[in-house]
Amino acid sequence: SSSHITVSDVVEMVNEYDAIGTKIGMIKKHEIADYCSDALKNGMDCRYLAYRNESIDKQTTAIRTMLHGRDVQSFVVGEPVVSLTGIQNVINNNHEGVVTAIGEPVLCHGIACVSVTLDDCLTVNAAIDVKEKKNKEIGFFRMFEKLKAQSQITTDFRAKAELLEQAQEASAQGYMIKDDIAELRPCVASTVHKAQGSTFDVAVV
């Protein structure tokens, strides 16, 4: 509808704020979670937008605590979520859906996960702690680069072969994590970049 706020509108507001150095909006920082949770409880499509992931994580926790209580789990049945990354032939980047079922916690490649089913009947293995998943995935790829670099400077053919084998194993571990574990986040907050092209009933920057 015409009342929707587009992300382009928000970006223009932020740029204007940066240019003239004056505050835009009436909501104080400590009121964001209360305002957003109230809008969501009243059936509005509300999203908190920020440039930094640290801000997103902080407000996501605060908003979800107001919606579901202090002991809220990573996923709640009935809650909209978005995929932060894509998995080929499984789930697309920025795919949104509503959680309809949650399985028991399991370890997948050493990472705590739960089976999450969305309203479009899509089921994925989702990391309970996205940061843990990212750190392990990146760690294996960095190990691959390090071992590969070491193999290129050694003159010992046996050592070179061993280093290359270890590098391939590290790369394989990284890709298994990347391809087997989804990164889902509740749709209460998003980076401005991720939200480009989206429309919301209420957008808070």
PLM feature spans:
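Conserved helicase motor core of P-loop NTPases
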Residues: 1-148
